[in-house]
Amino acid sequence: MFLKGKTALITGSTSGIGAGYAKALAAEGAAVMINGFGDAGEIESLRQELESLSGAKAAYSNADMTRPEEIRQMCADCAEQLGSVDILINNAGIQFVAPVDEFPEDKWNAVMDIILGSAFHATKAVVPGMKEKGWGRIINTGSMHSK
């Protein structure tokens, strides 16, 4: 198991590709903290699946990715519960589809807060620990689609 002894924090990981990242990292032995929203039972099932894949602990944070203080607390909780964050995958995102000339500014701001804001705040929170250890990986994901 390539990542045994490492801890990964993945935002936007209670379903979809984020859950896929979590499973892949757990299968390589990483302890994983997932984050997102959804059905509590499904999230708990995913958390248990991650533990069975890795043999390491898995945890869940319901931090709101638009709130910097919750993002900082999520990163601190991950370090406290699972060990310092070695791998951060900034995967949280939302989408709203409209032609640019019809795109509401409030929707644009919400998209940017989640995608860029959460990546900035999570990265800022974990980098000091990575520097202290002399090891860390940060992966920023995104997707786009067009009409």
Model-derived features: positions:
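Catalytic loop of short-chain dehydrogenase/reductase
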Residues: 139-147
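Conserved glycine-rich Rossmann-like NAD(P)H-binding loop of the short-chain dehydrogenase/reductase
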Residues: 28-45
